[in-house]
Structure formats: C-alpha cells, structure tokens
Amino acid sequence: MKQQNLLSKTIILLSLFFFAALNSHQLKAFKKEMKIAAVGDCLISWKVSHIKDPRFLNLVELLRGADCAYANCETTFFDAGKGFPAWKTIDPNQFCQPWGADEFKWMGIDLVSLANNHTMDFDYDGLFSTLDNLDRVDIKYAGAGEDLDHAGQPGYVETGAGPAALVSCSAFLPEKNFQASLSHPHMKGRPGTNPINTELTLRVNLETFALLKEARDNILKDLGANVPVKDIKEIDTLDYRWMKFTKGDHTEVLVKPDEKDLERIYSSIKTAKRNSRIVIVTIHEHNGDYKNKKPVKYQADFSRKCIEAGADLFICTGPHELWGLEIYQGKPIFHSLGNFFFQESRLISAESYQRYGLPVYTLDPSLSAEKVDEYFKNPGIWESVVPIVVFDSENKLKEITLYPIFLERNYPIYRRGIPYLAEGEKARSIIEGLKKVSKPYNTNIVFKQGVGKVAL
C-alpha cells in the first residue's frame, strides 16, 4: 500500500514538473517580440500571385514575415453570376471572384476587417460567400456576421508569438439594412456589419447659414407651404431632411456617434484583451477634413478611448488617403492608412452604369474610372505606407517602420491599383508627406535608407 502511495505521489510530482516545464516553455514562446504588419483598404479585382516584379514580391515578403498581417477587405468574395447586387444609394457594387481569398492567403494576410460599406454589396449571399471563402483559406475576420453578436465579436489569430485579436466597426453605412441586428429568443437578427450609428451636422459660417435659410424659405413659399417667420438670430439649426446645418465661425463636419454602440465596442475590446496578447481595433469612416487630412473630432476621441480600453493598435480605413500617425499612451493610431489595393471592378451593376451616365450594357474592361469620376485623379489615393509595428516581450511599443508604397495609376487597367514598394525620391516624398500630416500629433518620423522610422 505504501509503495502504491509512493508511486502515486511520484507520478503526481512528475506530472506537475512536466506541466510546469511545458507552461514555462509556452510562456517563453510568448515572451518574445511580436511583429504586426498592417495594410489599408483592399479593393482587389485581378489575380496578383503571378506577378514577378521584385517591388511587389518584396512587399509580399514583408507581410509573410510578420507574426500577423492585417488588411481591410473592402470587397466581397463572390461569384456574381450566382446572386444579385444589393441596391445602393452611392458607390458601385464591389466584388472579386472567390479566388480573391486565395490571393490574400498567398500574400500572407492573416486577419481582415469586414466592417465597411462594401461587405454587403451583394446582399446576404455575398456576405456569407465572403465568410465561407475566408474560412476555407483560414483567414480570420471581424466586423460582419450572421447577427450583431457575431459581427461585433473579436476575431482571433494564433501566432508563434501569441494570439492577436481584431475588433472592427464601421461608421459609414449609408444603407441601414447593411447593419447587423441583435437576435433574441423569438427571432433571429439580421446579418450584416458591426455599426456605429451617427448623426451628421454641417457647421457653416453665418453668411452661408443665412443663404441656406433664405433658399429653404423660398422653396417652401414656392410650394405654397407656411414659412415660419423667424430671424436668423432666433434659430441655431436648419434641417434639410437627411442633412442638418448649424451656425459657427468656420466650416466643419460634426458627427455625433451613438453612445450605446461605442460602449458595445469598448466591451468587445476588453474581451479581446483578456483573450489575446495584441488587440487591433479598426473603424471604417468616410467623414473627415480631407483638406487638412484630419479625422472628425469624435473619431479622434474614439481612437484614444479604444486605446484606453485595451487596444494596442488603432487603424482607420475609408478615406482612401494617408493621414496622420499619432502615438497615444505608447500605442499607434493611424488616422487613415490609405489604399493597399485600389482596382476597379471588372463588372458593376446596371444602377452603377446609370449613375455614371453610361449605357447599362457597357462591358468594356478597358473603361477607366478616371474617365467618369474626377476623384480617381487625386494622387493621394495612389500612395500610402505599410507599417511594420513591433512590440517587445512586455507588449510595449518597440519600433515602427513605414514602408512607402505606390499604386501606379498610369499602368494598364489590369496592373493599375496594385501596390509596389516605392524607391528613391518617390519613397522620400511619401514619407515626408506622412511626416507633415503627423506633425499636429507631435509624431517625429525620419526618412532613412528608403523607409520611415518613427522616433519613440
């Protein structure tokens, strides 16, 4: 009996020693640097895995060399012949054939955000096709799902340096039916994206406000409606159905977010932090000061509160331009990461053709969006950076290297909008541009050996 007890105790002690050693080994594995690569908006329409240009292949190696590579997937992976486009008030319906997920995987992308205004471009069939194809190639995601609980939950990817999490939301969803809704015991929720509902107001100077009031009053009079006799001094706002104007001393976009949505997202960040080593938070937002390349006030405040809630890296997507980099409480905030892929869809819906004043039977693949939309002539949408963010063994920010890229708009349509590493003066120009728009945040960026280095 004594021998059996002694044997049992020996087995228990050996087991404890084994598990302690195993746990120690695992902790050592996580007590190492963690490298995150991040890219911005990805609108991909053509295969890229066949490209042999070293400027592209070296960029791909940067993504593959990171512990985790993140991207904003601003398209649907969907066979458009098997479904139909959703009705949209603005923007063409964006899609890529299911092989797009394989191209992402080939590039080394591990984690994607789906909370944006294109995820639902082919309605629920398109959404579920995108989710299925990402699952098929084992790319993790956040920001969309079968209901609001699934759309709002973090996505996790396991890495050799520990798990990374993603929380993704969108404040730009013109079609409210693209938003996911809650399920309850008696009815399933609506599939869709993870929203931040907002109320938009345009602040204008007194002169513009007076002109707007006069125009509104004249329209109402012409329609035979009763016009309230009020002096401009007596009113603070004007409502034009979907638009609201308020008086001020300058022009500014004011966005008021739904506080319940914000609290829901902060809660998701805290959950992600408990279950992962590094937490990435992304927002998709189109409102902002495009002239000065600055986010609206609520977004800047939101990004900092996300850091306070546990985010290690905050990224805004949507403006399709490179805006400023801020370091807040030792964590990076990219106020807009610009484009990574910006390819035109090979087919768009009939409504989109009509919106551009084109015959609905136009199927010319050589048609350039530049011919129908001045926006595409903006040089800022054709260049950006790929940041490589390194956290040390204690999860403190150690290093940020900014690799400048360009998406050559003068290439043939099948090669346009593909990222290439920039070199020489082009590289310097991109980094100097980012340095300029990051100055208000007291972020010091140095151009050195073809890349940007952030002084920490």
Regions found by a protein language model. Name each.
Residues 2-12:
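Bacterial N-terminal signal peptides that target proteins for export
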Residues 11-21:
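Bacterial N-terminal signal peptides
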Residues 23-25:
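Membrane-interface motif at the C-terminal end of an N-terminal transmembrane signal
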Residues 27-456:
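Acidic, metal/ion-coordinating pockets
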